């Protein structure tokens, strides 16, 4: 493992012993790229190191305003320009739609071709795209709908009413939190440890909620992530 640190940015490159040290200034064993590439103009030394690392796993830690988005998009453009990957081999994931749109716009300005073949988006957006493409294997209808937070709460309230659940003892909002927490931990109802009667009831309702969603062809945000993971 090689660790580089400078003001505002840290770069950790795993399995660095697989490559000669001189590759860290941008050379690639198969396709030697030019350090004079227009893509690298305006980058500082630390950003340039991060952009031109050889293929492998790298962790870049940087604070606010240090140019993380610029480094990431330039890294993608660099890999494409040097022929190390094809557009379909790129996946860039972020937390917000705004950041995803910014990355797409920057790459469109950098590259001479359409960037639609790349996988650029939020975690939920990319999971949605994956499940749409493989809905049969995922056990979903092609036209499955996504429940937002309010939709999910409404679905749980409907379930509680149907099965005469005591909503003072099991508030619907808390049930949605319980279900979301289980999914974040990768747990289906059968995987949830049952330690007391209340948890047992919550797990039963979780299973009923899953059955309801499956019948209606809908998924919540947690389901997008969990089903993609299972796929």
Spans of features found by a protein language model:
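A basic/glycine-biased coupling hinge at the interface between accessory DNA-binding modules
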Residues: 5, 11-38, 55-59, 77-231
